[in-house]
From Swiss-Prot:
Taxonomic superkingdom: Bacteria
Subcellular location: Cell membrane
Key word Transmembrane helix present: yes
Keywords: Cell membrane, Membrane, Transmembrane, Transmembrane helix
Membrane topology classification: Multi-pass membrane protein
Record-given protein name: UPF0391 membrane protein Xaut_1725
Pfam family, one: DUF1328
Annotated family: Belongs to the UPF0391 family.
UniProt GO cellular component terms: plasma membrane
Transmembrane intervals: 4-24, 30-50
Amino acid sequence: MLSWAVTFLVVALIAAVLGFGGIAGTAIEIAKIIFFVAIVLFVISAVAGLMRRGRAS
């Protein structure tokens, strides 16, 4: 799950670079949405991983 969050974060950053660089004007809003979704998924994955690691010990 953490790998999916990191993947979405990378995709969002690439879309942001392309959008803010003027290549695709509409990609700016899409990049913002994907970026925040990726951040939320990353936080959820990190918390779930910490909880899982805590139970395994």
